[in-house]
Amino acid sequence: MRQNQLIEKITNEQLRTDIPDFRAGDTVRVHARVVEGTRERIQLFEGVVIKRHGSGISETYTVRKISNGVGVERTFPLHTPRVAAIDVVRQGRVRRAKLYYLRNLHGKAARIPERRRG
């Protein structure tokens, strides 16, 4: 077995299959596992996906939310075991793959219309 095939086999075993289909503009709730000392707990992070980056085992996504009037962005690896679950709260209708322009918008201007299902 060549090295490329071996790496591909190992990464395919580590890919998660329980990830819902979501894209930039969707509002998601990420259940992140946080270790504090000897205890482990679930911390929720709900916000708008502003980008997805990469492919395969190294794919990441960035979620943005406003907390106490301050914009907070957090980047998660898609296939990490540190994320217990990802819930899609609502699907947004956007025309871009990267929503960096949301960083400069405030209030109602930063809202994303909901995508129609059909």
Swiss-Prot record:
HAMAP family: Ribosomal_bL19 (MF_00402). GO terms for molecular function: structural constituent of ribosome. Signal peptide: none annotated. NCBIfam families: rplS_bact (TIGR01024). This is Large ribosomal subunit protein bL19. Pfam families: Ribosomal_L19. Keywords: Ribonucleoprotein, Ribosomal protein. PANTHER family: LARGE RIBOSOMAL SUBUNIT PROTEIN BL19M, RIBOSOMAL PROTEIN L19.
